[in-house]
Curated annotation (Swiss-Prot):
Keywords: Amino-acid biosynthesis, Arginine biosynthesis, Cytoplasm, Lyase. GO terms for biological process: arginine biosynthetic process via ornithine; L-arginine biosynthetic process. Pathway: Amino-acid biosynthesis; L-arginine biosynthesis; L-arginine from L-ornithine and carbamoyl phosphate: step 3/3. Belongs to the lyase 1 family. Argininosuccinate lyase subfamily. Its EC number is 4.3.2.1. It catalyses: 2-(N(omega)-L-arginino)succinate = fumarate + L-arginine. It is found in: Cytoplasm. This is Argininosuccinate lyase. GO terms for cellular component: cytosol. It comes from the Bacteria. One of its GO terms (molecular function) is argininosuccinate lyase activity. The gene is argH. It is an enzyme of class 4 (lyase).
Length: 459
């Protein structure tokens, strides 16, 4: 007798190397807890519907729980010849409890079984990711709250542009992560759907109760179409997209961390605990954790592209191609969870060099817009003011000084309306104070922003 669940149809058994190519047990055993959870719900429902006896159901459930326990105690070795987690568990169950174990698969296919596992797994992982995002956001808010008055240069095109609050800058990433969190939250509506009972593709002739398994597995709803239930992998693509976009945001943040920690910037100092050294250059302290996070975006985005291409042109119901949905998702989940934890620890332990930041904005032309705005208050059209300030900046560059160093007489040569109050006007801290529009970098506006963020975190 063949050891294959489908062996009755075949005269020749696959060779071992073919089994190895076909098998997924090396990675889909990740789903063991979800597979057993789904099977317990299925066995419970079968008994309640009178499809199998209560005694058989109880034997099955106890057998499944013993397999789960022994697996986590490293007491079970699964076989590639049994292909996947589903058939390995069924084989072990029959070995332990006898013929009753063979009744578990009544009214069920591996098609709806694996779909159920993947929905349960993805739901749990997305909930974990949301919690990790919120935890990172909380650290960002703490850092921002302590740096409302810390001034730094804001950049466009990686050129110094205008002075901004460090709190305002870092809170940008709070809002990126907030959108990420919202996307994950919204996706749960499309993940939290029960496919169990769809069987291979057309449902089953047994009098099953899909609403019961939906309740037992804490799903929010169930698929209305059995063929859609076993064909759908949209939720995996959506999860991979949300992971990839969150990783892109972490990568952008990581790039700033890397730049800020350079000797050229010296805006922050990373903790030794989140840095590494060089095997040849003893002075080096490298921001490897930030660089790794930046690099891992290619990995998660690659998994997204791979899954999109796997589904492209795929016929309905289950096709073996769908086995390829797992490794990419598992790896992407592992990657983002690790990246979020690392990022939280990295920024929580970094030192913000406030004096360096505050001094930096006094050694550039990031207050040039303020000079133009000052001229506008003297009833000079902004475009004319822009031209005047551009000429003043050019002279400063040629003479090697900054706007706060320009003598009043020189200013007045460019326009007679410039008074001695210009020096106070151009101070970086005053540049921030004047920016009070909603969502701007002024202190009162940033504090308002922080209040909104804290309220969101408390929900």
């Amino acid at each position: 007798m063949s050891n294959k669940a489908w062996g009755g149809r075949f005269e020749v058994q696959p060779e071992e190397w073919v089994d190895d190519f076909n098998a997924s047990i090396t990675f889909d055993q990740t789903l063991i807890d979800q597979d057993i959870e789904g099977s317990i719900a299925h066995a419970t429902m079968l008994a309640n519907q009178g499809i199998i006896s209560q005694q058989d159901s109880e034997q099955i459930i106890q057998g499944l729980k013993s397999i789960q326990h022994d697996y986590h105690q490293d007491q079970i070795q699964f076989s590639a010849s049994l292909e996947d987690i589903h058939l390995n568990i069924e084989h072990e169950l029959i070995k332990r409890i006898g013929d009753a174990g063979g009744k578990l698969h009544t009214g069920r296919s591996r098609n709806d079984q694996v779909a159920t596992d993947m929905h349960l797994y993805t739901k749990k992982q997305v909930q974990d990711i949301i919690a990790l995002i919120k935890s990172l956001q909380s650290v960002i808010v703490d850092i921002a709250s302590n740096n409302v008055d810390t001034i730094m240069p804001g950049y466009t095109h990686l050129q110094r542009a205008q002075p901004i609050s460090f709190a305002h800058h870092i809170m940008t990433y709070f809002w990126m992560l907030q959108r990420d969190q919202q996307r994950f939250e919204d996706s749960l509506k499309r993940i939290d759907i029960n496919p169990l009972g769809a069987a291979a593709l057309s449902g089953t002739t047994y009098p099953i109760d899909r609403h019961e398994t939906t309740a037992l597995l804490n799903f929010g709803s169930l698929y209305e179409n059995s063929l859609d239930a076993v064909s759908d992998r949209d939720y995996i693509i959506e999860t991979l997209h949300n992971i990839s976009l969150t990783m892109v945001h972490l990568s952008r943040f990581a790039e700033e961390i890397i730049f800020w920690s350079t000797d050229e910037a010296k805006f922050i100092t990373l903790s030794d605990a989140f840095s590494t050294g060089s095997s040849i250059m003893p002075q080096k302290k490298n921001p490897d954790m930030a660089e790794l996070i930046r690099g891992k975006v290619g990995r998660t985005t690659g998994h997204l592209m791979s899954m999109l291409m796997t589904l492209k042109g795929l016929p309905l119901a289950y096709n073996k191609d769908m086995q390829e949905d797992k490794e990419g998702l598992f790896d992407a989940v592992h990657t983002i969870k690790g990246s979020l934890r690392i990022f939280e620890g990295m920024i929580q332990t970094m030192t913000i060099n406030k004096e360096r930041l505050n001094q930096t904005v006094k050694e550039d032309f990031s207050n040039a817009t303020e000079l133009a705005d000052y001229l506008v208050t003297k009833n000079i059209p902004f475009r004319t003011a822009h031209e005047i300030v551009g000429k003043i900046v050019l002279e400063c560059i040629q003479q090697g000084h900054y706007l706060l160093d320009v003598p009043l007489s020189t200013y007045q040569q460019h326009h007679s309306s410039i008074d001695a109050d210009i020096y106070d006007y151009l101070q970086p801290e005053n540049c921030l104070k004047r920016r009070q529009s909603y969502g701007s970098t002024g202190q009162s506006s940033v504090k308002q922003q922080l209040d909104v963020a804290k309220q969101l975190l408390s929900q």
